[in-house]
């Protein structure tokens, strides 16, 4: 008990901190990183990319060589950069204000910024089950120190289904073995109880009939329950599969269990709470025991083919290699030798972890005859094995202190006068109320068996191991591709134990029976050359070989002293078995699948026994169906979005940006300016929301602390009530004893015994008090001790109440401090000068509207300029028709005096006549009618520009006052007749 100055202790377990935590620096770095990524993605929308200008070609072709010039581009770039910089400054200021507000001393720290989230799995796996508190629930709670039934939910009525996906995510298809301490505590209590009353029990006889047989026989049944926040996962469907196949020997290093369906419960199924060693169990346990007959998973395994493996795959629960049945902390419960049959280490004890995988299942006794396994009569006389399996305990079995027959119908029941609790033996005499000689046919029985070669995934058939001198070279008897992992690719034509050189370079011993059936393959990486060098170094084996001789079924080597080499007890190579002094007796040496070169004395590849388990191992096996979890259905933790979600969001943003229209810089500047004004209005609410959330988080945390303190008060009160109840039970027992004494005194007084010097009072029986002495707490404490514990409970409860009241006061204070949004804004900033700009809002809006109108006007003017430039490029070709004036005949003869036709080099001055306004209008109107603009309704307003274009053309040709004249040009005149000249209405023709 701690002192009153220290913090009061809790009755529940600690270690309930949030599973995930992040520092504020990590959060800030993450935010900055995401902001930089968004900026890189958005780069180029405002600057850095050239926007294409719209051009209009009246002739239907684009002027590829004409360079477009935007006179507003420098202004747009400069203004956009200025606005962008202002927005960046505003953003930095807002972030700085937010960080300053969150770093205030009276607010929660960055580590305390938490969120109430739902755990995706709903629970957390507990690997160290010895740290989990547990209690028992039974009807006989007054005798056993357990809780009454109803204190915990019934697992058959209240449970939660767990999906297969969550099971695979948490357990990775590996339902592990757990050495639970709960059964060990029960065994420790029984052992302590027997030791404290050992002297009294030695004086008893087998005629004494007591209620203690319910305890010994395991009739008191109950459940194991775990308190919140712990729970139990009860598997409903499971199967086993091999893992880590050894490529040298072919055995499975691990057999894993895959649970595909489970339920979360608070308590286990009902089971015997305590019992001594026994053979058969009650029929109430049959379903639970049968559930441990785990079948192989539906995968490609050789043992699933009954033609290759008669009987199919093995069924049962595989206790893994390396499991520790009794941990080091309770080594005093181990005893000298293991009492559990095949559940033992390599020395037959429980001190070391298991060296071989052990299977436990409910036995199938349908094929047994007179208490013996099938084909038992066909065994060799005196042998304890048949069909490759060595059986322990066939004939006589130990059951609840009695020797009974393995034949359930014989009814043999001999009392031994001893009880085995774990590895300790206690003399005890009792006459049980149950029928010892009953026919126990149909009762469930545990069967413990071991595959020493651990090749259960290949075959469930047990074989008798070959002796080393029966291993010979299989010349021509083995075909196919043989290996320790592929038995099906191998064929044999003769029974025997064939030494074969594998394709991988090692050696194989192929066991062939019935001239064609391969029952086993043992292998090693040692090649033939290395083995033969060892063989040649053996004494007197230079001229020997491993060839098969003899007419036996299996064959043998020629010289028994030159068999397959092995390492002797001195770890030296030898080829001969050890013999006696006279040389008449010779050791039987066998070859094992996992020890190819060792000195193996075990004849059979399997070991099995019936029964032999006490309540501790019975509970331990039934509890393997359960896994302890820590419920985290609603807990505090930091939410971290997965990377796939962030990538999906980034893709969505990019797709949305690609779908947006490409706008020019000035439009984006206007939009950003509007957004900046809106952001300035919303930034205040955002900061106020952050402040309000900060206060709210503090209040929620205070409420959580107050609730936790109240929970501690409830737990301490419950512990105190339990202690008071214990004192009341002691008081009841003592008062009952006093009443019995008073009653007897009154009876003796009526019988006139009062005149004696003392009353005729006999000693009362105290068996009832002895029944409860084995529990973990002592019920026979003195009143002074009980009062002292009550005072300690009261002091602890007072401290907890004060702490709870303080936490509640803090929670109420924090709850009252939560302000509304506007008060939070006033607290965060000084808004007296911030709202002065509101009077300029109308002017700002008018300015924005004016900018928009100006922008529209500039767009219209720009389009008009583009249209004018295109129309201005229309060219007309002037065709001058020169009509020769008539000349005198006498002059004609004079001009033709050179002997030519008079038209070879004649030049006239070009006579040019100016176009009238009507001619220009006709040409322009004809160009408009033939242009593609006339067919598009969006360009119809451009028709209003035609008069301006006509005036401009006329002024360009004639000048402002018509003073401009064309320069005279001399042109060649074709000498043609006037009748052949074209007749035109005017002098201008459009080309």
UniProtKB/Swiss-Prot annotation:
- In residue numbers, the region (Fusion peptide) covers 665-685
Q: Which residues lie on this side of the membrane: Extracellular?
A: 107-840
Description of post-translational modifications: Specific enzymatic cleavages in vivo yield mature proteins. Envelope glycoproteins are synthesized as an inactive precursor that is N-glycosylated and processed likely by host cell furin or by a furin-like protease in the Golgi to yield the mature SU and TM proteins. The cleavage site between SU and TM requires the minimal sequence [KR]-X-[KR]-R. The transmembrane protein is palmitoylated.
Task: List every stretch annotated Immunosuppression.
Answer: 731-747
Keywords (alphabetical) are: Cleavage on pair of basic residues, Coiled coil, Disulfide bond, Glycoprotein, Host cell membrane, Host membrane, Host-virus interaction, Lipoprotein, Membrane, Palmitate, Signal, Transmembrane, Transmembrane helix, Viral attachment to host cell, Viral envelope protein, Virion, Virus entry into host cell
| Annotated positions for site Cleavage | 664-665
Q: Tell me, what is an example of a GO biological process annotation in this record?
A: virion attachment to host cell
Protein origin, superkingdom: Viruses
- Show which residues sit on the Cytoplasmic side of the membrane: 862-991
S-palmitoyl cysteine: lipidated positions: 864
Sections of the chain in a coiled coil: 697-747, 788-823
GO CC aspect terms? host cell plasma membrane; membrane; viral envelope; virion membrane
Q: Which residues cross the membrane?
A: 841-861
Q: Where is the signal peptide?
A: 1-106
Q: What does this protein do?
A: The surface protein (SU) attaches the virus to the host cell by binding to its receptor. This interaction triggers the refolding of the transmembrane protein (TM) and is thought to activate its fusogenic potential by unmasking its fusion peptide. Fusion occurs at the host cell plasma membrane.
The protein's assembly and partners = The mature envelope protein (Env) consists of a trimer of SU-TM heterodimers attached by noncovalent interactions or by a labile interchain disulfide bond.
Q: What is this protein called?
A: Envelope glycoprotein gp160
Which species expresses this protein natively? Maedi visna virus (strain 1514 / clone LV1-1KS2) (MVV)
Which gene carries the instructions for this protein?
env
């Amino acid at each position: 008990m701690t002192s009153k100055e220290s913090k009061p202790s809790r009755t529940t377990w600690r270690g309930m901190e949030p599973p995930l935590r992040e520092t504020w620096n990590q959060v800030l770095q993450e935010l900055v990183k995401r902001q930089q990524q968004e900026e890189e993605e958005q780069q180029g929308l405002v600057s850095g990319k050239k926007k294409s200008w719209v051009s209009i070609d009246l002739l239907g072709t684009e002027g590829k060589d004409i360079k477009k010039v935007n006179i507003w581009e420098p202004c747009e770039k400069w203004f956009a950069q200025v606005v962008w910089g202002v927005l960046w400054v505003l953003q930095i200021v807002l972030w700085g204000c937010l960080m300053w507000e969150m770093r205030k001393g009276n607010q929660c720290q960055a580590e305390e910024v938490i969120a109430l989230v739902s755990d995706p799995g709903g629970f957390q796996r507990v690997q160290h089950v010895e740290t989990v508190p547990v209690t028992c629930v039974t009807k006989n709670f007054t005798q056993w120190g357990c809780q009454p039934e109803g204190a915990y939910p019934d697992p058959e009525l209240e449970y939660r289904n767990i999906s297969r996906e969550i099971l695979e995510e948490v357990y990775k298809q590996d339902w592990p073995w757990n050495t639970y301490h709960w059964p060990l505590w029960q065994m420790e209590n029984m052992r302590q109880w027997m030791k404290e009353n050992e002297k009294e029990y030695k004086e008893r006889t087998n005629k004494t009939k007591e209620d203690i047989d319910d305890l010994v026989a395991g009739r008191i049944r109950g459940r194991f329950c775990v308190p919140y926040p712990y729970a139990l996962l009860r598997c409903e469907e499971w199967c086993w599969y091999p893992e880590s196949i050894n490529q040298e020997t072919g055995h499975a290093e691990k057999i894993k269990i895959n649970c595909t369906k489970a339920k979360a419960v608070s308590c286990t199924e009902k089971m015997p709470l305590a019992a001594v060693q026994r053979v058969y169990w009650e029929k109430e346990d049959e379903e639970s025991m049968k559930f441990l007959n785990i079948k192989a998973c539906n995968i490609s395994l050789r043992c699933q083919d009954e033609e290759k493996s008669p009987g199919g795959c093995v069924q049962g629960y595989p206790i893994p290699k390396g499991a520790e049945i009794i941990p080091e902390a309770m080594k005093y419960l181990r005893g000298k030798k293991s009492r559990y049959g095949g559940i033992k280490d390599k020395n037959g004890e429980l001190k070391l972890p298991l060296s071989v995988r052990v299977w436990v299942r409910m036995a199938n006794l349908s094929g047994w005859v007179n208490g013996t396994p099938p084909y038992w009569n066909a065994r060799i006389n005196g042998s304890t094995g048949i069909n490759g399996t060595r059986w322990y305990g066939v004939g006589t079995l130990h059951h609840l202190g009695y020797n009974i027959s393995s034949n359930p119908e014989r009814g043999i029941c001999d009392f031994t006068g001893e009880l085995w609790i774990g590895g300790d033996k206690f003399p005890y005499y009792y006459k049980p109320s149950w029928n010892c000689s009953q026919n126990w046919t149909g009762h469930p029985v545990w069967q413990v068996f071991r595959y020493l070669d651990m090749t259960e995934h290949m075959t469930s058939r047990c074989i008798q191991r070959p002796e080393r001198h029966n291993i010979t070279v299989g010349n021509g008897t083995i075909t196919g591709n043989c290996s320790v992992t592929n038995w099906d690719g191998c064929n044999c034509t003769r029974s025997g134990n064939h030494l074969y050189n594998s394709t991988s370079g090692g050696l194989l011993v192929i066991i062939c029976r019935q001239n064609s059936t391969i029952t086993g393959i043992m292998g090693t990486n040692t090649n033939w050359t290395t083995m033969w060098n060892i063989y040649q170094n053996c004494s007197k084996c230079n001229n020997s070989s491993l060839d098969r001789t003899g007419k036996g079924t299996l064959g043998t080597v020629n010289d028994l002293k030159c068999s397959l080499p092995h390492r002797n007890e001195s770890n030296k190579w030898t080829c001969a078995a050890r013999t006696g002094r006279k040389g008449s007796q010779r050791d039987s040496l066998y070859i094992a699948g996992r020890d190819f070169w060792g000195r193996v004395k075990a004849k059979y590849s399997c070991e099995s026994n019936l029964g032999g388990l006490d309540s501790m191992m019975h509970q331990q096996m039934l509890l393997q169906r359960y896994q302890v979890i820590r419920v985290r259905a609603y807990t505090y933790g930091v939410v971290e979005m997965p990377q796939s979600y962030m990538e999906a969001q980034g893709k969505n943003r990019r797709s949305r940006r690609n779908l947006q229209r490409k706008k020019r810089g000035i439009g984006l500047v206007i939009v950003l300016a509007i957004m900046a004004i809106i952001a300035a209005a919303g930034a205040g609410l955002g900061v106020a929301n952050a402040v309000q959330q900060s206060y709210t988080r503090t209040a929620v945390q205070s409420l959580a602390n107050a609730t936790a303190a109240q929970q501690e008060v409830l737990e301490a009160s419950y512990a105190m009530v339990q202690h008071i109840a214990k004192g009341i039970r002691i008081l009841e027992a003592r008062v009952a004893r006093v009443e019995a004494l008073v009653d007897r005194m009154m009876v003796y007084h009526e019988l006139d015994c009062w005149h004696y010097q003392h009353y005729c009072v006999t000693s009362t029986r105290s068996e009832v008090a002895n029944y409860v002495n084995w529990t973990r707490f002592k019920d026979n404490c003195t009143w002074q001790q009980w009062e002292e514990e009550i005072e300690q409970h009261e002091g602890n409860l007072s401290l907890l109440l004060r702490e709870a009241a303080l936490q509640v006061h803090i929670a109420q204070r924090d709850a009252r401090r939560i302000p509304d949004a506007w008060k939070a804004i006033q607290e965060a900033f000084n808004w007296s000068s911030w709202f002065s700009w509101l009077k300029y809002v109308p002017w700002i809006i008018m300015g924005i509207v004016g900018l928009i109108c100006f922008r529209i006007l500039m767009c219209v003017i720009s389009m008009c300029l583009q249209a004018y430039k295109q129309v201005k490029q229309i060219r007309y070709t002037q065709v001058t028709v020169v009509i020769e004036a008539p000349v005198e005949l006498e002059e004609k003869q004079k001009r033709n005096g050179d002997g030519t036709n008079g038209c070879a080099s004649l030049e006239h001055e070009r006579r040019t006549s100016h176009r009238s306004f009507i001619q220009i209008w006709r040409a322009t109107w004809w160009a408009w009618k033939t242009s593609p603009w006339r067919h598009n309704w969006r360009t119809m307003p451009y028709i209003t520009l035609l008069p301006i274009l006509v005036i401009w053309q006329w002024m360009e040709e004639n000048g402002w006052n018509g003073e401009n004249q064309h320069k005279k040009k001399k042109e060649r005149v074709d000498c043609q007749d006037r009748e052949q000249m074209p007749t035109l209405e005017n002098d201008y023709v459009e080309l």
